[in-house]
């Protein structure tokens, strides 16, 4: 087989079409037999509440009696759990099946401490498709006040256990340092992974929402709660599949209305009144921090106020066991301030909910990146040395709200939002391209890149040098509103969903730069190109409107299908004008005008670079037809869940594009197939076994700008072109996992496999001019890109006393990256294929000794990289670390948290990056006033060896970047806790 045309595509487009045809036939068969599934059973549903408080009375006994002889026909318990975690549906809702026979009946409801209620129940004139009848709410009256004793269940401090479908983590079982926030706890949870962006995974599954006491606080911003909620307030962390408001409203699970959530449960004493903490401190190197976090809880409302300001970059605490590496640091030096408010109000009647938040954030970031890049080219590579110095200033305000109303036969969900951002960024950039590897030069020789005349040694292999200073400022805003309503039908289990949203965005951007390119030939400076430029990117605005209707047809209780139609219209209007100020006298190479200043409009308006200025207008119309087939089956020993979710989208997109050389209007019509969440899952009822297989298809149409056949020379070293023949790309994801849990032993393990190929991937292939270092990019469709993963992970305790526990993961990654790279003057570009194989391992052991703990940790990634070119030299690379962590209780009520880790790198092209860095952090703390005040001293990178190096690789080359990091420091800070209970 010719390796230049090799591709592994498990699902072709013809096969995908066959799948859709088979699915349609299946739906027809199901619909044809649907009526036979309506057996002679009528489901009665309702809810039981206290007459005075309107609070549910779960556990009430509900019976249906024959009105003629009072014989009991059916009975049930009004206790609903929805199969989604044991505590989120502790309600008195009930469902009960009776023979489908018209007549007069009596409903009897009883519960200890309440008077028995009797309700007449005439069941007359049953409709043909009426399979259930809603009896509404029945209120029970108390004959007298009863004092009920609270039941307290004491359990041993196991780290986690399963209760139904819910994983329950006991927060008190983890050894955490004084002053630790929620992020420290989440990092230690068995099976959990916490990314630096706040994204959480449990057993490889993405956590869609982070909840607080079952409420969706800080929606979409996990880091607010992770960075500000103290762990001393946390009782348990629960992970489960949560059903949404629509499922609760309808009394049945709605397709697509389930989210995988992590629910943080507070200790009982913090569930009412005001609770919070205040923290402040300062240290060496002008480090500082200040924090306020306060919450108020009542039985029907929650309010949170928070503020945070610091210049510490990293929220990690010494002695916390995790898989943190220096690359997780926020790049550079960051000074940020953040403040916000979050609220939630639930009506006691359950008829409405109000919630929302507002946040303002300011950040200054200074980052210096030193990058070495190897460019894979036919007949010999080239090598880049890049230094980027950026100072970014941003202010952002965001607010979103939710108004939810519930009526007898419909609900209404309204969500408005508004976001605004201002930015002012300064940048410095230096790029030197060589025909020889940087390994051949000393550091002092390479540093001459920044001088007016580069060193003689570099001149011999220099191709080009780019020096650029830039200033970018502007603002953006986006606002929108969505409305959704679910409508119930009185005599049918079916329901109708209506959805609409509208959004508007507006952006303004001013970009200034002084850009100089020196071209070299035969060891001499051959030519210099200097440009003083002003980009006026405004207006840039657009709007979008969406409407959707979906009808859910309930075939039987365990089988339903949802048919939907969605229409979206999006309009975008962009203007970008480029002015060449260097053509004015005194604005050229030796200009003294400060970057960001402009001459009069009359002076520069005629200097427009027409070839690289443009205005574009685009209108998209998308029609999406979807279906959602759900089947679930409960048995005595196992549960099955399966769903198929095919979508067919018809896109009609029109663009008008005009610049100095092109004035064109064109339309692209595309048919896209998508399958967002198709899966089959099996679980044992004892929760010891779980298997799941998922298949997703994500079809993406090419960006319309890529169809415009223009030659953009805005960046003389990176020229872009269009391609009118691009095809849609399809990413297929096949994911399978098996989980084994040992509840009594506190052990679990998981094995997961992933295979993710991309059909018709859009690659920005390029041809390279070795004489000037100029790249000319053109988008092309390529096949053969895919990646796969196989790993085994486990966590749990290792001894009977539960003092020794572990977390471990071992696996492999394989990635095949395909691109197109050619040389200037060659007719066609060659396929560049790079194969990357990585072996991963993580292991952490923790041993608990009374109120102290000590742990060992090790993480490693070992990779082998090969390519299809004859001149490609395969190489190996490794990143690994190992060390220990400890939380120690000392005399005089002192507590020490510390971690010592060796970070090692091997196989980097830049030999200075192949290093062994010992990083030591420590925290000494002491509580005062019964724990209300905690004083802490932190030492960060005490040995001063921390460095931040990242490496990326694809078919175009290898990039290694060293970023500046915060210098070592000591900081003294104190935290005061408060808890104000209502009288």
What residues fall within each predicted segment?
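Short, polar/charged loop or turn motifs at beta-strand boundaries
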Residues: 166-189, 197, 202, 212-217, ...
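Short, acidic, small-residue-rich periplasmic hinge/interaction motif at the N-terminus
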Residues: 49, 63-65, 108-112, 128-172, ...
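Short, ordered, surface-exposed loop/turn motifs in non-cytosolic proteins
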Residues: 53-76, 162
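A short, amphipathic beta-strand motif
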Residues: 42-50, 137-138, 764
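Short, surface-exposed beta-strand/beta-hairpin micro-motifs centered on an aromatic residue
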Residues: 79-99, 199, 225
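A short, solvent-exposed loop/turn motif at the edges and junctions
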Residues: 70-71, 89-97, 104-125
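Periplasmic plug
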Residues: 199-245, 261-266
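Primarily recognizes Gram-negative and organellar outer-membrane beta-barrels
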Residues: 75, 88, 220-223, 243-286, ...
